[in-house]
From Swiss-Prot:
Membrane topology type: Multi-pass membrane protein
Organism: Tropheryma whipplei (strain Twist) (Whipple's bacillus)
Transmembrane segments: 39-59, 74-94, 108-128, 136-156, 163-183
UniProt-recorded name of the protein: DNA translocase FtsK
Entry's Gene Ontology molecular function annotations: ATP binding; ATP hydrolysis activity; DNA binding
Chain's role: Essential cell division protein that coordinates cell division and chromosome segregation. The N-terminus is involved in assembly of the cell-division machinery. The C-terminus functions as a DNA motor that moves dsDNA in an ATP-dependent manner towards the dif recombination site, which is located within the replication terminus region. Required for activation of the Xer recombinase, allowing activation of chromosome unlinking by recombination.
Localization in the cell: Cell membrane
Amino acid sequence: MSAKKSYLKVWRGLAGAAGSCARVFSKKSLARRDRRDQLPFALFLFGLVGAVFQWFLYGNWLSGIVSEYTVAAFFGGFSIVLPILLIGFSIWLFRNPQKTHDNIRVSIGLFMFSSFSAAFLHFSAGFPYPSSGIRILSTAGGIIGWLVGLPLTTLPSYLAKTVCIIFIVLSVSVISKTPISKIVRVIFRYAKWLFNSDSVKTSPNSSVSSSSEHQELTGRDMPDTAGDNRHDETVTVLSGTSLTGSPVSEYHGESSDYALPSLDILNSYPPAKHDDAENEKVITALSGVLRQFSVNARFSGFSRGPTVTQYELELGEGVKVERIIALTKNISYAVASDKVSILSPIPGKSAIGIEIPNKKRELVALGSVLQSIHPDAHPMTVGLGKDSSGGFVLTNLTTMPHLLVAGATGSGKSSFVNSMITSILLRAHPSQVRLVLIDPKRVELAIYSGVPHLITPIVTDPKKASEVLQWVVKEMERRYDDLASFGFRHIDDFNLAVRAKKIASDSRELTPYPYLLVIVDELADLMLVAAKDVEESIVRITQLARASGIHIVLATQRPSVNVVTGLIKANVPSRLAFAVSSLVDSRVILDRPGAEKLVGQGDGLFLPISAGKPIRIQSSWVTENEILRVVEYVKSQAHPDYYVLEVQNQGNIDSHIGDDMPLLLKATELVINSQLGSTSMLQRKLRVGFAKAGRLMDLMESMGIVGPGQGSKAREVLVTPQDLDSTLARISASVSDSKLD
């Protein structure tokens, strides 16, 4: 008995020494009670013995016999690789004994990799049966290769091998916890480098995404039916923003070969390095709280996200969930954080989630999020960021169908809006998606001025914004008139029929309608100026516009009941809350607490239309330099095709122009070319008095050429020099029409 104990002691000592050697370069320290060195030491010895027989004694008759009747009998020719896998897996177990779920995952992945590799070799050797003898089996795929490949024998050999390769790639994804899309991109990249061929490439912004980590939260992608790639060669300025103007049809910019930007235009960042020692310290602190209050529960694992880590707590028998919730303040004290959130239960698990902010936050770059979107995905699909387990969060704006965003200063609301617009510019053609940007702050969205996706210059005047929203309502009604006339229920079906030339109109040429995305950066400013008109237009849009391809995103810093009214909330089903200052604000935006405990800088709670509970995300981040590069690129591809704003009383003013027509045309040319809406400039250049110059400026404002007066400041010019000729022609035509009337 003493000899047996001595052998066990020696075995444990050798296992401990091997484990210490394996952990010598590890950054984290491992307590002695947490070490599990005996199993990995046994695997290490098997791998070492296998390496000696398979590599160093290769060709020896004794080694051949031993190999044929052991590992080669099971795995065939793949047995020469097994020592590497066994030694590598043993080192992993030495260094990560407590990661139970990860260890099971890696074990399953390694077995899949070995089995399907053996099956591939078995098919390559002609798929011999066991009756052929052990010698032939050991040179093919062995017993394992035969068993795994047996269900595939009904397929042709090349298809069976393809299935094996697919499962091998899947096993690599399971082992490395790497999305399949990234593995495919690496394979393509090395294939292109190896063969130096242009035929092995992906599209400029391509990335094949099929990983289970990439969570498509809002349903399937819609087909790409909004817009076409056909353009006219000239820029056409249509008077589509008056409440009686023509409907929005597809883009007519001047570039017929518009190319989407490559995702390489965005910055690339190295992957974040996680320090598991920090998480182990938190688990130790949390376990101490449970022991202190005699709570029968244990931590089964954790999921580290970019901002917070979610620790999974499994309760013992007879322990109420309320006991854990009652310990929230004690947990906050133990981990020195006042931003602790408790999720009970974790969706799909019999466990409670305790979310604690990380000391070192991970940067979620927009480029990495967009890489996870399939290149054939819907053009309105945007990358929101990452969830609390590190998976990418994507959403299709058409399925939301409208979004309400709120957050205090510094919470990351404006960064999210920038990421969303940049996603659209990177993934959508101007013929597919048109934008209406309303920016009462005047500076938040000014960087996007002149992009070809804009349907009108960026609206900064709250009064003008009310008129724009009224125009959107009219545009929605026009689209519904077309849908009703031709018997369609959704704009996608109408566009498909137009492209297939299945429908036609006697009065006009039918063209596909693009999606129309309206973004209001600060709803509170609009509600202060024209609350009744703005609320009425927003409610009409949110109630009816989904089937017409019109969607709206409302952002505000003050989610009070005066800004986010009951009617607006009732018709905007999807919400995104960033950090707010009070529980009341959180209830206004989410109808529940939680947003007041967010840590800011992009930390948010996303509540899509299909979710019962909000999902914690870290919003994607895009720098100003990246936005500038994207904007400059899309502006170099095409010019904007504006629908110039016109007010309702334009006809009354035009009819009284009289002999001032030549002066008006000269004034228009001066203002557009100089991009300076100054009354004193008109006085000097045209040599007219103050009253005449002021009247000319009022006429130009009524025609949508300049914005409203801003005191002593120059007026904003709403028309670019590229649109000068068409604007002058429009003025002349409108005056001629008013005279004929």
